[in-house]
Amino acid sequence: SFRFFEEIIMRLATLLGLSVLHLALCVLTCTAHHPGLEKSRVSYENMGDEENAEERSCVHERETCSKVRGPLCCRGECICPIYGDCFCYGS
């Protein structure tokens, strides 16, 4: 009878482990498909002195920005909602 309980405990532990792995995979997949779930960071191009701000190809507040494509960075933060285009916030 002890063997029976041991087998049940092993099956439950395996099921629990697989459930945790499945949940982690779902979270990673969701984050990959919806990058707006993570607050975007200021582009490296923005990390400079204020003197040359006009020379950088950055857009202004409430204009569309992009973290991935081209030079469309923000002077503030590029916020990407789950649905719709990314937009600049702040300056």
From Swiss-Prot:
The keyword Secreted applies. One of its GO terms (cellular component) is extracellular region. Residues 1-32 form the signal peptide. This is U1-theraphotoxin-Agm2a. Residues 33-56 form a propeptide. Its main location: secreted. Keywords: Antimicrobial, Disulfide bond, Ion channel impairing toxin, Secreted, Signal, Toxin. The keyword Secreted applies. Expressed by the venom gland. It comes from the Eukaryota. GO terms for molecular function: ion channel regulator activity; toxin activity. Contains 4 disulfide bonds. Putative ion channel inhibitor that may also act as a antimicrobial peptide. It is found in: Secreted.
